[in-house]
Amino acid sequence: MYEKLIGAHVSASGGVELAPVRAHEIGANAFALFTKNQRQWAAKPLEASSIRAFKANCKKWGFGSEAILPHDSYLINLGAPEPEKLDKSRAAFVDEMLRCDQLGLTLLNFHPGSHLQQVSEEACLATIAESINLAHRQVPNVIAVIENTAGQGSNLGWRFEHLAAIIDQVEDKERVGVCLDTCHTFAAGYDLRTKAACDETFAEFERVVGMHYLRAMHINDSKGKLASRVDRHHSLGMGEIGWECFEYIAQDARFNGIPLILETIDPDIWATEIATLRKFSTQKEN
């Protein structure tokens, strides 16, 4: 059993049951997926045969629920200022949680939301937290995993304080967590280029949010520079962050047992990137 759960966001095209197969093919022991089309509001319910096959394939290839990170639709805005869009987003988010529960999955990764220049940051963060509370009341078992953002436009979640404010207002603290995306973190202004910078950034996360809330990570290099507030992923070692950060994460025991998911731009080298991270992880533990 590897201590590091390393994988990529694989396609579920042709059925969710194919995602674990694709993850296994690239040497992953973790993976992310969309359980429905991420660019559409409506989705037909999961078929019983797909659910059975998904669970069987996960069992066959050794993927436990702690290693699988479903991502919700990009259309959902849990902080939407317009009541109609908010209601639609909340209903869609509950549906995403239900799909996770049907598949036996316990994590749901999502982007927190945007104020669209219509309400204050504080009001939007409170709305996001209430959206999570409403979903928790309707769906058991599934943990809402808030992804930090790069800070583009009016998107919230780029400052660690935003994440802390949401968590503070979520009633069931056992069912809320954070997914830190390295590209987003760097683009938001938190340096990761050296081990010293990583020490400082994760110490700040511990101070503001708490490492015990870290449920997953997206492992991406960045095309944009530090504090660019631009969400543009790059292959590992080819962007502005560089390999030192990814070696740091692979070798630090604080990141054991959570999905470390590539969303890098060239799927053809995912297997190589996973193998490199795995090699780093076996060299030493900090």
Curated annotation (Swiss-Prot):
Superkingdom is Bacteria
Q: Which CDD domains match?
A: AP2Ec (cd00019)
The cofactor required is: Zn(2+)
Q: What is its EC number?
A: 3.1.21.2
- Which InterPro entries did the record assign? AP_endonuc_2, AP_endonuc_F2_Zn_BS, Xyl_isomerase-like_sf, Xyl_isomerase-like_TIM-brl
From the UniProt record, list the reaction(s) this protein catalyses: Endonucleolytic cleavage to 5'-phosphooligonucleotide end-products
Q: SMART domains this protein is in?
A: AP2Ec (SM00518)
Q: Which GO terms describe its biological process?
A: base-excision repair
Q: Which residues bind Zn(2+) 3?
A: 184, 231, 233
Q: Where, by residue number, does Zn(2+) 2 bind?
A: 147, 181, 218, 263
Keywords carried by this UniProt record: DNA damage, DNA repair, Endonuclease, Hydrolase, Metal-binding, Nuclease, Zinc
Per UniProt, the cofactor note for this protein states: Binds 3 Zn(2+) ions.
| Short name of one Pfam family | AP_endonuc_2
- Its biological purpose: Endonuclease IV plays a role in DNA repair. It cleaves phosphodiester bonds at apurinic or apyrimidinic (AP) sites, generating a 3'-hydroxyl group and a 5'-terminal sugar phosphate.
Q: Which family does it belong to?
A: Belongs to the AP endonuclease 2 family.
This chain belongs to the protein called: Probable endonuclease 4
**Lineage, please?**
Bacteria, Pseudomonadati, Pseudomonadota, Gammaproteobacteria, Vibrionales
**Which gene name does the record give?**
nfo
